[in-house]
């Protein structure tokens, strides 16, 4: 695909007239979805796993920077909170395996990207994260993390897991959906009023800064399969051509070879999430690094939570 917006991105963030009409036609389904989501949140009893847990989530579908935020928090926990055994538990979206799987333990990666999913494999390459566990059942993943020796557990995309007692960081980005509807008429998985359930609403610019790095290379083509690829807009002019695929797309070697040949290029310019899927294909790569810097208010909130949790666990 060769557009800044996939169809879904356009539908949720920059809809044309037909997409707007479709959104209104789907409102009855959104109402049903909303009722089910609210019921799920109200009647789940919270379970305390007796270990510090930080969840990074958002209200909308698609990318919001959860992965770089989790990596930034892991780095902060290790450097400033003196926590060495930082584990992460996530679903492992679009992986070709089922059930609980330990992707990384200590410094050893234990499975392929197909088995782990691209997000989990990106975490596996993060030196600040000691263990990566994928599991559709987060509770089972948490128990496995405790058994393996976790000091702090990060939960990727777990804001909606209301049955787990945790410190919820909710990311709020500067780019917001066109409509404030829940799925399928809008991009929201939960209504906006659920922001009040978060322990910390992290506003881009106020509580964290997002930055990315990559040098210009006119012998490269930018290829990515992340949600909201327009987030990479500053890098579009750094490559000879740009190709955007659906989120979590599994790249094919021949397909990428043809794109390089078409533009007379010799280098791919992927994000790290894309890189883990193409690294064994033999291509020359120049990675776009997506990073987040935590600001003091968020750092202090995390520090206080860790301190309070450590004291509670001792009692």
Question: What is the predicted role of each segment?
Answer:
Residues 32, 67, 123, 156, ...:
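Residue-level signal for inorganic ion chemistry
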